[in-house]
From Swiss-Prot:
This protein's name: Serine hydroxymethyltransferase
Keywords associated with the record: Amino-acid biosynthesis, Cytoplasm, One-carbon metabolism, Pyridoxal phosphate, Transferase
EC id: 2.1.2.1
Organism field: Shewanella frigidimarina (strain NCIMB 400)
Chemical reaction(s) catalysed: (6R)-5,10-methylene-5,6,7,8-tetrahydrofolate + glycine + H2O = (6S)-5,6,7,8-tetrahydrofolate + L-serine
Location(s) in or outside the cell: Cytoplasm
Role: Catalyzes the reversible interconversion of serine and glycine with tetrahydrofolate (THF) serving as the one-carbon carrier. This reaction serves as the major source of one-carbon groups required for the biosynthesis of purines, thymidylate, methionine, and other important biomolecules. Also exhibits THF-independent aldolase activity toward beta-hydroxyamino acids, producing glycine and aldehydes, via a retro-aldol mechanism.
GO molecular function: glycine hydroxymethyltransferase activity; pyridoxal phosphate binding
Cofactor(s) needed: pyridoxal 5'-phosphate
GO CC aspect terms: cytosol
Pathway: One-carbon metabolism; tetrahydrofolate interconversion; Amino-acid biosynthesis; glycine biosynthesis; glycine from L-serine: step 1/1
Length: 417
């Protein structure tokens, strides 16, 4: 017999301890992984609701199960809010992840073996943009493009590759690129060869929603995103479009269900609906503006301390610190900073001589610290501490000192006050 009083703490203390330990870790560590963020208690409330009990294969008004009248309301709210947020005429909120959203686009628009032009993972792309270890690289003929010596996307080279290889689809978007993408130029290239332009905006979706980063939606045939990262919602994916092409929309829907998924996660879709409503509020724009201000402030300190930033700066929420030529690997930097309660991730940089398991760089992002309330002053102070550790990564005196400073700063800015 189920009772509302049932709880994890009494029933499963081992699991409860792990959950509590993770809560403590998040409160006492500074999160700088560019793809991570803190979602709101309202989103978590939706995800913990009884919507988790409901199967709802199909789409609103066209389900394969009965009893879907209320989950139809939930999904419709999420769809309409996503369309409003991004200026789209189509939205599918069912993908369980960004990768599954991307997979659906490949399935809807391509045949196995088709040629695709995508950003090289080593230059800032994503696994699902054509990495040999991913489905995208295994099933399709991938032609990679990258960035030039200045860290910018070379659109002339992209156009040359497109004309030479005639891909059926060009992918825009990134996981470790700190510049502005010229979506209109990419659409021109795609149109020149009759290709689809598909944009994965996962990393900058929140910035785009707030109008602080150029939107790809008017230019791309189809756009995907995760709903966490800068959007600060639940972990999941979405597909949107403003192509006004009902045939395309039908293909995309079919590629999600039944093509790649069965029942949607209605509790997560409810969380997405909440997050989209939050992203439509005026304070969300203020937050995203601060995300970029904090990232720029951090870059300023890194450059002043003699560290190289790929692309020379940032126009979004992230930066890639290039450690080539230093007696420190990305893996070592990641571990040293972790010892001081600063969480980053090792990351390959262009022309990296080291393996992806070691790397010569670290990726840093400002969404989570901004969510805690950090402004430029705290971002600069924190970056100074990071540089102190990177300057002398094996010095435990420095690490211990920085850890104490981090704990004090975290206490001033709790995740959930």
């Amino acid at each position: 017999m189920l009772k509302k009083a049932m709880n994890i703490a009494d029933y499963d203390p081992e699991l409860f301890k792990a959950i509590e330990d993770e809560t403590c870790r998040q409160e006492e560590h500074i999160e700088l992984i560019a793809s991570e963020n803190y979602t709101s208690p309202r989103v978590m409330e939706a995800q913990g609701s009884q919507l988790t009990n409901k199967y709802a294969e199909g789409y609103p008004g066209k389900r394969y199960y009965g009893g879907c009248e209320y989950v139809d309301v939930v999904e419709t709210l999420a769809i309409e809010r996503a369309k409003e947020l991004f200026g789209a005429t189509y939205a599918n909120v069912q993908p369980h992840s960004g990768s599954q959203a991307n997979s659906a686009v490949f399935m809807a628009l391509l045949q196995p073996g088709d040629t695709v032009l995508g950003m090289n993972l080593a230059h800032g792309g994503h696994l699902t943009h054509g990495s040999p270890v991913n489905f995208s690289g295994k099933l399709y003929n991938i032609i990679p493009y990258g960035i030039d010596e200045a860290g910018k996307i070379d659109y002339d080279e992209m156009e040359r590759l497109a004309i030479e290889h005639k891909p059926k689809m060009i992918i825009g978007g990134f996981s470790a690129f700190s510049g502005i993408v010229d979506w209109a130029r990419m659409r021109e290239i795609a149109d020149k060869i009759g290709a689809y332009l598909f944009v994965d905006m996962a990393h900058v979706a929140g910035l785009i929603a707030a109008g602080v980063y150029p939107t790809p939606v008017p230019h791309a045939h189809v756009v995907t995103s995760t709903t966490h990262k800068t959007l600060a919602g639940p972990r999941g994916g979405i597909i949107i479009s403003a192509a006004d092409d009902e045939v395309l929309y039908k293909k995309l829907n079919s590629a999600v269900f039944p093509g790649g998924q069965g029942g949607p996660l209605m509790h997560v879709i409810a969380g997405k609906a909440v997050a989209f409503k939050e992203a439509l509020e005026p304070e969300f724009k203020v937050y995203q503006q601060q995300v970029v201000k904090n990232a720029k402030a951090m870059v300023e300190v890194f450059l002043a301390r003699g560290y190289k930033i790929v692309s020379g700066g940032t126009e979004n929420h992230l930066m890639l610190v290039d450690l080539i030529g230093r007696d420190l690997t990305g893996k070592e930097a990641d571990a040293a900073l972790g010892s001081a309660n600063i969480t980053v991730n090792k990351n390959s940089v262009p022309n990296d001589p080291r393996s992806p398991f070691v790397t010569s760089g670290i990726r840093i992002g400002s969404p989570a610290i901004t969510r805690r309330g950090f402004k430029e002053a705290e971002a600069k102070e924190l970056t100074g501490w990071i540089c102190d550790i990177l300057d002398d990564a094996t010095n435990t005196v420095v690490t211990d000192r920085v850890k104490g400073q981090v704990l004090a700063l975290c206490a001033r800015f709790p995740v959930y006050g």
